[in-house]
């Protein structure tokens, strides 16, 4: 049987760039999604295209340590470090997690000027019935 010749331009032969390469944007939007189990931080440009992202799980925190404020702070600094030269940013925070304040502290400590901070946590207008309360 003849050996298969790889097609030039196929995905195996193309060098895929690393996720940690640096991007240059002047103004962006930082989306923060916090829960009690994890924190996800995504940096987008004005049009909404994701430039970089990070989470507490990708930073090496496993299990219950992903939900801590320190893990959220590390995730925010890793997501912002990839974007070089971003001067102004809008922050959208979603969710009830512990890491909300820690993410804001990390963003302000990185030198990015915050134009506004918006809480976009979805609130039901008496929608679905919530799950029953836990009895421990």
Swiss-Prot record:
* Chief place where the protein resides: plastid
The answer to whether keyword RNA-binding applies is yes
**Mind telling me which InterPro entries this protein's record contains?**
Ribosomal_uS11, Ribosomal_uS11_CS, Ribosomal_uS11_sf
What UniProt keywords are attached to this protein's entry? Plastid, Ribonucleoprotein, Ribosomal protein, RNA-binding, rRNA-binding
Tell me which PROSITE patterns the record gives.
RIBOSOMAL_S11 (PS00054)
Gene3D superfamilies given in the database record: Ribosomal protein S11
Q: Which GO terms describe its biological process?
A: translation
Subcellular location as annotated: Plastid
Query: Which family does the UniProt entry place this protein in?
Result: Belongs to the universal ribosomal protein uS11 family.
The protein, known as:
Small ribosomal subunit protein uS11c
Q: Where does this protein come from, organism-wise?
A: Epifagus virginiana
Gene that this sequence comes from: rps11
